A protein has these predicted regions:
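Asp-box/WD-like beta-propeller blade repeats and closely related beta-sheet repeat scaffolds
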Residues: 95-113, 118-119, 123, 127-188, ...
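Short loop/turn segments that connect beta-strands within beta-propeller blades
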Residues: 78-82, 137-141, 200-205, 243-248, ...
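Short, conserved, GDST-rich strand-edge loop motifs in beta-rich repeat architectures
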Residues: 172-192, 278-315
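Residue-level detector of Asp-centered blade-edge/turn motifs that repeat once per structural unit
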Residues: 59-62, 117-121, 163-167, 224-226, ...
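Beta-strand-rich domains and repeat architectures in extracellular enzymes and scaffolds
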Residues: 2-11, 21-24, 42-75, 339-347
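Surface loop/turn motifs at the tips and blade-to-blade linkers of beta-strand repeat domains
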Residues: 44-49, 88-91, 103-108, 146-154, ...
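Blade/loop signatures of beta-propeller domains
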Residues: 9-43, 80, 318-327
Length: 371
């Protein structure tokens, strides 16, 4: 018999035992070195009838945050007195967009992921997983589509972006040219390397592909001096750096190897980077992600999303984020190791001594006081 078949069968048998007996201690991710388990003290702000505040952005006046949710809306936080209000939508077809979470309707309702404000104009730029790169004015409403295809190929999974206001360009990612957002686990487990990093020129409307062959291209962040742009590769647990200017211009290197699965990257005012972890990685998840044949075999089993996700996060919801220097050095690690308050972090935005924390799966955001 083919050795690979035997190995696959053995691997799947082991995973079946783990899932059957709920042996979380076998594959629970260990604490991160030097971490502070303080995120459970975060203040929780619930969303009314909404789920999945993936990204958070503040407008030029400091109001917000604004966040995109799973039913295609973009909400604005107006403080505890007024709560969340509708600000914008990415699709005009809203008739059936009535459930907080309905993955089967995302292609109709839209799914806004990365958000960034142009601090000069007040326009909000949106990476919608299904409708591409969009923009909406300071007064909100229906977003306008800017980019829906590149090189004749539709954008299937627009994910995140950053804006270079000096050059008037937007760097953005398409996580996959094979899978849609609602199939993100298939992209991660199948060793899909069809992700791209692109540049959109706001004046000429031209799109340039900067990087191809990325593994689930995710979060994007421009350096403070604009010399390089970072892009997170989720399955490989690393952040890649593309040099834009200077003696290294055009070169690509590894900025950081991570002990978790990265989502969005956000730069703070000092030029450091907060990287959100959907989850830390443990023995089982590292093994799965490091051996594509295991992931592909998992996808063939009738496990369903919840059980596979359970495996990947180590059997226990938790939250983690890491702060990196401009050179990729670890400066700070924060956790909610028991998932008491926060879970499945998708973005960390530092503002005025606080961390505003989003989650692509939860019905709330968190505010953590750094002081």
């Amino acid at each position: 018999m083919n050795p690979r078949i035997i190995l696959t069968a053995t691997a799947l048998a082991i995973l079946s035992v783990v899932l059957t007996f709920n042996t979380t201690h076998v594959f629970t991710p260990p604490p991160l070195p030097g971490s502070h388990d303080h995120l459970h003290t975060a203040e929780i702000i619930h969303l009314a009838g909404a789920v999945g505040p993936e990204s958070l952005a503040f407008d030029p006046s400091g109001e917000g945050p604004y966040t995109g949710v799973a039913d295609g809306r973009i909400l604005k936080w107006q403080g505890h007195a007024h709560g969340w209000v509708d600000f914008a939508v990415t699709s005009s077809n809203r008739k059936e967009c009535v459930r907080p979470f309905a993955p089967e309707m995302e292609h109709v309702c839209g799914r806004p992921l990365g958000l960034r404000f142009d601090q000069k104009t007040g326009d909000l730029y949106i990476a919608d997983a299904y409708f591409g790169l969009q923009v909406v004015g300071p007064n909100g409403g229906l977003a306008t589509q800017l980019v829906t295809e590149v090189e004749g190929q539709p954008l299937l999974f627009t994910n995140d972006m950053d804006i270079d206001e000096h050059e008037d360009v937007i760097y953005f990612t398409d996580s996959s040219t094979i899978f849609h957002r609602r199939q993100f686990m298939s992209s991660i487990l199948s060793s899909d390397k069809s992700g791209k990093l692109m540049k959109y020129n706001k004046s000429s409307k031209e799109v340039t592909v900067l990087l191809r062959g990325l593994s689930f291209a995710n979060g994007v962040a421009l350096s403070k001096d604009r010399s390089f742009v970072l892009v997170a590769e989720t399955p490989t647990r690393r952040i890649m750096r593309l040099w834009l200017h200077g003696p290294n211009a055009g070169n690509l290197d590894v900025f950081a190897e991570l002990p978790g699965v990265p989502d969005n990257i956000r730069r703070n005012s000092r030029g450091e980077f907060w990287v959100a972890f959907h989850c830390k990685t443990g023995p089982i998840s590292n093994w799965i992600l490091s051996n594509p044949w295991v992931g592909k075999a998992l996808l063939k089993l009738p496990l369903g999303f919840k059980k596979i996700h359970y495996l990947m996060v180590g059997g226990k919801p938790h939250a983690a984020a890491i702060r990196l220097s401009e050179k990729g050095e670890v400066l700070e690690v924060l956790e909610d190791s028991e998932g008491k308050s926060l879970r499945f972090v998708s973005e960390v935005e530092e503002r005025n001594g606080k961390l505003w924390i989003g989650s692509v799966m939860m019905p709330f955001i968190g505010i953590y006081n750094l002081n």
